A protein has these predicted regions:
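Acetyl-CoA-dependent GNAT
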Residues: 3, 7-82, 87-88, 100-102, ...
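Conserved G/P- and acidic residue-centered "switch" motifs that form tight phosphate/ATP-binding loops
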Residues: 94
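C-terminal "cap" of GNAT-fold acetyltransferases
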Residues: 112-115, 119-157
Length: 157
């Protein structure tokens, strides 16, 4: 199966929300303090539409959205890798690599550092982030609504 990485369109909003909620349920993160309770979930095509903010989706050959990730503004020098999720069937097939590469390439145009937050039980994701040069930090760069995400990473761009 081949996958296309492209910018989100309005028609993708509901599909992206389903991908994110499916993954959050899988990891027991379907509660407040995670992306589960984000008020903008399902409106990404509207939210990620300004300079320094962008969201990409991974689409399979049938047109199904199987993953996504975004870059969002935190400070003038620091962005956040946001809402990076892939459905189980799309994992191990290079989809996350291609999403990450698109996000980091974009982030380098506007920022000096990239921050992210994740859950302690998402160990495979943590290894993935470390492979891309992210390193753990003790404190959040800024306070986000994701207070349940206890693991924080930073990367120099």
């Amino acid at each position: 199966m081949s996958y296309t990485i492209r910018e989100i369109e309005k028609k993708d909003n509901k599909s992206v929300e389903i991908v994110i909620r499916t993954c959050l349920i899988e990891f027991g993160a379907n509660h407040d303090g995670t992306a589960w309770s984000d008020p903008d979930l399902g409106r990404f095509s509207e939210i990620y539409n300004s300079q320094g903010n962008k969201y990409w989706v991974a689409e399979d050959e049938t047109g199904k959205i199987v993953g996504g990730t975004g870059i969002g503004y935190l400070t003038d020098e620091i962005c956040e890798l946001q809402k990076m999720y892939c459905l189980p069937d799309a994992r191990g097939k290079g989809v996350a690599n291609r999403l990450m590469e698109a996000a980091l390439e974009y982030a380098k145009k506007y920022y000096k550092k990239c921050y992210l937050e994740t859950l302690d039980n998402m160990t495979r994701a943590q290894r993935f982030y470390e492979k891309y040069g992210f390193y753990r930090v003790d404190k959040p760069v800024v306070i986000t609504e994701h207070y349940a995400c206890e693991v924080k990473y930073l990367k120099e761009l």
